[in-house]
Regions:
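Single conserved hydrophobic/aromatic residue that forms the stacking wall/gate
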Residues: 1-13
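Short amphipathic beta-strand starts and helix->beta connectors
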Residues: 23-26, 65-76, 121-131
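Catalytic core of tubulin tyrosine ligase-like
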Residues: 29-30, 48, 144
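Long, charge-patterned amphipathic alpha-helical coiled-coil/hairpin "stalk" segments used as oligomerization
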Residues: 78, 82, 87-155, 159
Length: 191
Protein backbone atom coordinates (compact mmCIF):
# COMPACT_ATOMS: atom_id res chain seq x y z
CA UNK A 1 0.00 0.00 0.00
CA UNK A 2 2.85 2.38 0.89
CA UNK A 3 4.63 1.75 -2.45
CA UNK A 4 1.38 2.27 -4.35
CA UNK A 5 0.84 5.68 -2.70
CA UNK A 6 4.43 6.65 -3.38
CA UNK A 7 4.08 5.76 -7.08
CA UNK A 8 0.80 7.69 -7.30
CA UNK A 9 2.43 10.72 -5.68
CA UNK A 10 5.37 10.54 -8.09
CA UNK A 11 2.98 10.32 -11.06
CA UNK A 12 1.07 13.34 -9.75
CA UNK A 13 4.31 15.32 -9.41
CA UNK A 14 5.39 14.33 -12.94
CA UNK A 15 1.99 15.32 -14.36
CA UNK A 16 2.07 18.67 -12.56
CA UNK A 17 5.64 19.28 -13.73
CA UNK A 18 4.63 18.56 -17.34
CA UNK A 19 1.70 20.99 -17.07
CA UNK A 20 3.91 23.71 -15.60
CA UNK A 21 6.55 23.21 -18.29
CA UNK A 22 3.87 23.47 -20.98
CA UNK A 23 2.63 26.76 -19.46
CA UNK A 24 6.17 28.13 -19.24
CA UNK A 25 6.95 27.26 -22.87
CA UNK A 26 3.75 28.97 -24.05
CA UNK A 27 4.41 32.06 -21.95
CA UNK A 28 8.07 32.34 -22.99
CA UNK A 29 7.11 32.40 -26.67
CA UNK A 30 6.45 36.14 -26.56
CA UNK A 31 9.29 36.89 -24.15
CA UNK A 32 12.03 35.88 -26.58
CA UNK A 33 13.81 38.18 -29.06
CA UNK A 34 16.57 37.08 -31.42
CA UNK A 35 19.40 39.50 -32.13
CA UNK A 36 21.72 38.86 -35.05
CA UNK A 37 22.91 35.41 -36.04
CA UNK A 38 24.08 34.20 -32.62
CA UNK A 39 22.13 35.72 -29.73
CA UNK A 40 18.74 35.71 -28.07
CA UNK A 41 17.16 37.69 -25.24
CA UNK A 42 14.92 35.76 -22.86
CA UNK A 43 12.95 38.25 -20.78
CA UNK A 44 12.43 37.04 -17.23
CA UNK A 45 9.58 37.57 -14.79
CA UNK A 46 8.26 36.07 -11.56
CA UNK A 47 6.75 33.10 -13.37
CA UNK A 48 9.89 32.21 -15.37
CA UNK A 49 12.06 32.48 -12.26
CA UNK A 50 9.65 30.41 -10.16
CA UNK A 51 9.63 27.71 -12.83
CA UNK A 52 13.45 27.79 -13.01
CA UNK A 53 13.78 27.38 -9.25
CA UNK A 54 11.23 24.55 -9.17
CA UNK A 55 13.05 22.79 -11.98
CA UNK A 56 16.42 23.10 -10.21
CA UNK A 57 14.94 21.75 -6.97
CA UNK A 58 13.26 18.88 -8.80
CA UNK A 59 16.43 17.85 -10.62
CA UNK A 60 18.95 18.36 -7.82
CA UNK A 61 16.73 17.50 -4.82
CA UNK A 62 18.73 19.83 -2.57
CA UNK A 63 16.00 20.65 -0.05
CA UNK A 64 15.69 23.82 2.02
CA UNK A 65 19.35 24.79 1.78
CA UNK A 66 19.25 24.61 -2.01
CA UNK A 67 15.97 26.55 -2.03
CA UNK A 68 17.65 29.41 -0.14
CA UNK A 69 20.55 29.38 -2.61
CA UNK A 70 18.24 29.33 -5.64
CA UNK A 71 16.13 32.18 -4.25
CA UNK A 72 19.27 34.21 -3.60
CA UNK A 73 20.47 33.58 -7.16
CA UNK A 74 17.20 34.11 -9.03
CA UNK A 75 15.26 36.73 -7.03
CA UNK A 76 17.38 39.59 -8.46
CA UNK A 77 16.22 38.54 -11.95
CA UNK A 78 12.57 39.30 -11.19
CA UNK A 79 11.66 42.73 -12.62
CA UNK A 80 10.88 45.31 -9.91
CA UNK A 81 8.15 47.21 -11.79
CA UNK A 82 10.41 49.82 -13.38
CA UNK A 83 12.73 47.57 -15.34
CA UNK A 84 12.92 44.72 -17.80
CA UNK A 85 15.30 41.86 -17.01
CA UNK A 86 16.71 39.56 -19.66
CA UNK A 87 19.00 36.60 -19.95
CA UNK A 88 21.10 37.44 -23.02
CA UNK A 89 22.57 34.29 -24.53
CA UNK A 90 24.99 33.63 -27.34
CA UNK A 91 23.89 30.28 -28.71
CA UNK A 92 26.60 28.85 -30.95
CA UNK A 93 26.79 25.07 -31.31
CA UNK A 94 30.21 24.81 -32.97
CA UNK A 95 32.87 25.15 -30.23
CA UNK A 96 35.47 26.67 -32.57
CA UNK A 97 33.05 29.30 -33.88
CA UNK A 98 31.75 29.95 -30.35
CA UNK A 99 35.26 30.63 -29.01
CA UNK A 100 36.08 32.91 -31.95
CA UNK A 101 32.84 34.92 -31.68
CA UNK A 102 32.91 35.25 -27.88
CA UNK A 103 36.59 36.28 -27.99
CA UNK A 104 35.64 39.22 -30.20
CA UNK A 105 32.75 40.43 -28.02
CA UNK A 106 34.39 41.63 -24.82
CA UNK A 107 32.16 43.96 -22.78
CA UNK A 108 29.15 43.45 -25.07
CA UNK A 109 27.05 43.47 -21.88
CA UNK A 110 27.89 47.16 -21.42
CA UNK A 111 26.94 48.07 -25.00
CA UNK A 112 23.50 46.45 -25.07
CA UNK A 113 20.38 48.60 -25.00
CA UNK A 114 16.64 48.92 -25.48
CA UNK A 115 15.66 51.95 -27.55
CA UNK A 116 12.26 53.51 -26.76
CA UNK A 117 11.06 56.55 -28.70
CA UNK A 118 14.64 57.35 -29.73
CA UNK A 119 16.06 57.00 -26.20
CA UNK A 120 18.60 54.26 -25.50
CA UNK A 121 18.34 52.54 -22.13
CA UNK A 122 21.64 50.73 -21.65
CA UNK A 123 21.74 47.43 -19.81
CA UNK A 124 23.08 47.14 -16.30
CA UNK A 125 24.69 43.70 -15.93
CA UNK A 126 23.89 41.61 -12.86
CA UNK A 127 26.70 42.01 -10.31
CA UNK A 128 27.27 38.30 -9.67
CA UNK A 129 30.51 37.86 -11.69
CA UNK A 130 32.44 39.61 -14.43
CA UNK A 131 31.16 38.35 -17.76
CA UNK A 132 34.24 39.38 -19.75
CA UNK A 133 37.57 37.86 -18.77
CA UNK A 134 41.02 39.46 -18.87
CA UNK A 135 41.65 38.18 -22.41
CA UNK A 136 38.56 40.03 -23.69
CA UNK A 137 36.43 36.93 -24.13
CA UNK A 138 32.82 37.39 -23.06
CA UNK A 139 30.55 34.82 -21.48
CA UNK A 140 27.86 33.10 -23.51
CA UNK A 141 25.29 34.07 -20.83
CA UNK A 142 24.57 37.55 -19.45
CA UNK A 143 21.92 38.68 -16.97
CA UNK A 144 20.87 42.23 -17.83
CA UNK A 145 18.63 44.85 -16.22
CA UNK A 146 17.13 47.64 -18.31
CA UNK A 147 16.10 50.35 -15.85
CA UNK A 148 13.28 52.54 -17.17
CA UNK A 149 12.21 56.00 -16.09
CA UNK A 150 8.46 56.74 -15.96
CA UNK A 151 8.40 58.43 -19.38
CA UNK A 152 10.16 55.40 -20.94
CA UNK A 153 7.51 53.08 -19.48
CA UNK A 154 4.74 55.32 -20.81
CA UNK A 155 6.29 55.32 -24.29
CA UNK A 156 6.93 51.56 -24.16
CA UNK A 157 3.24 50.95 -23.41
CA UNK A 158 2.21 52.97 -26.50
CA UNK A 159 1.65 50.29 -29.13
CA UNK A 160 2.43 52.83 -31.88
CA UNK A 161 5.89 53.45 -30.40
CA UNK A 162 8.68 51.41 -31.99
CA UNK A 163 10.88 49.62 -29.47
CA UNK A 164 14.24 48.21 -30.51
CA UNK A 165 16.83 46.10 -28.77
CA UNK A 166 20.43 45.99 -29.90
CA UNK A 167 24.11 46.40 -29.24
CA UNK A 168 26.57 49.15 -30.10
CA UNK A 169 29.43 46.64 -30.01
CA UNK A 170 31.74 47.08 -33.01
CA UNK A 171 31.74 43.33 -33.72
CA UNK A 172 28.02 42.77 -33.14
CA UNK A 173 26.11 45.87 -34.33
CA UNK A 174 22.65 44.31 -34.54
CA UNK A 175 19.16 45.68 -33.89
CA UNK A 176 15.82 43.90 -33.58
CA UNK A 177 12.39 45.51 -33.39
CA UNK A 178 10.09 44.15 -30.69
CA UNK A 179 6.79 42.89 -32.08
CA UNK A 180 3.53 44.06 -30.54
CA UNK A 181 3.08 40.54 -29.14
CA UNK A 182 6.41 40.80 -27.32
CA UNK A 183 5.63 44.32 -26.14
CA UNK A 184 2.24 43.19 -24.83
CA UNK A 185 3.90 40.41 -22.83
CA UNK A 186 6.63 42.68 -21.46
CA UNK A 187 4.29 45.54 -20.52
CA UNK A 188 3.04 43.35 -17.66
CA UNK A 189 6.52 43.54 -16.11
CA UNK A 190 5.92 47.22 -15.36
CA UNK A 191 2.90 46.51 -13.15
Amino acid sequence: LHDKRRRQRQMCIRDRRKAIRKEVVAMKKNRRVELGPHSTFYFENFFTMKAQIQEMLYIEKGGDEQLRDELEAYNPLIPNGSELVATFMFEIDNPITRKKVLSSLGNVENKTYIKVNGNKIFAVPENDVDRTDNSGKTSSVHFLHFKFEDHHVKDFKDMDCTVEIGTDHEHYPHISVLTNEVKTALIKDFD
